[in-house]
Amino acid sequence: MKKILFTGGGSAGHAVPNLALIEELLSKGKTDVCYMGTDGIEKSIIAAQKIPYYTIDCPKLVRGKSFTALKNNLHIPCAFQKAVTEAQKGLEIFRPDLIFSKGGYVALPVVFAAKKLHIPCVAHESDFSLGLANRLSANKCKTVLTSFPETANKLKNGKYGGAPIRRTVLSAKREDARRALGIGEREKVLLVFGGGSGSKAINDALRKSLKSLTDKYLVLHVCGKGNVVESTVKNYRQYEFIADMGTMYACADLVLSRAGAGTVFEILALKKPSLLVPLEGATRGDQKQNAEYFRAKGLCRVLPQNQLPSLEEEIDKVFADTDMKQRLLENTFSQGNERILGEINALLYG
């Protein structure tokens, strides 16, 4: 039986797409699967699959010119070489036939180690522009699959694959989800979340407008670990974290969220109207690029973080935007699981 090793982490956005593909491969039972990552969030996300997991210590570049950043980054060359050596040891134990890299800082030493051992690699980039790890490792991969067609066209070995999305997200039904959460069919539901650890800016802006918003909508707020506050406001439900986002999406009439690629493609695949608040100060402006791409196609609205005081007004506009809802019904962006798995199987089995 052929074996594939997945890598990628540092944030949920690098690990959850891997999880979507791992679940598909395990359900077919034809391929052994293992994972290499840090002891961080990717390990907790992958743990439920009960597959072999090899942990490596990997240095993370600190952006900026502060003393703390400079001090940290001085150690990166030595720490990176150590991480490559650790990754090589893990690969020699697992002996995979193929590496699938989802990016993030942990993926880079794994791809470098795989190159030394002549193990073929496939990378996947979810965002409109390549992240640092994928930029540095692209020439060591046989193929770089992308979620955006335009991104693939910029790479010699680029190929459009689409976005991996978990089946549990795609399969949840509105009627079943609302029944499970005790939500009436006619209630207007606003789903709010700010990424894997929540967003203080979104949380604060939402709560300032909460009383008037909950007069019109039932608000489901995934606010992040440690961010639940005492509240007696009716039509407001708080959650630290939700593992089954499929149920939450299925209930929602509108989604307010950050603009990470994984989230945006889930929203589009489910044809949900959305108001996106791109993360400010991101290293390459990836969330702004993602959001602007789909805003230009009329598939979402975008609210810059410095305009969050107008949140309620913008939410009302999205609910009233019938043209957007029609465009969403007609949009052709869907999950890329089958295309990506086709590429994997072609490399594994020829």
List each model region and its residues.
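Conserved donor-nucleotide binding/catalytic region of nucleotide-linked donor-dependent transferases
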Residues: R301, N306-T332, G350
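Short amphipathic alpha-helix
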Residues: H14-L26, I41
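Acidic donor-binding loop of glycosyltransferase active sites
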Residues: P96-L98, I242, A250-F265, K272-P273
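Conserved nucleotide-sugar phosphate-binding/catalytic loop shared by glycosyltransferases and other
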Residues: K2-G9, T31-K82, P304-N306
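Glycosyltransferases and closely related glycan-assembly transferases
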Residues: T85-I99, A107-V122, R135, N139-T143
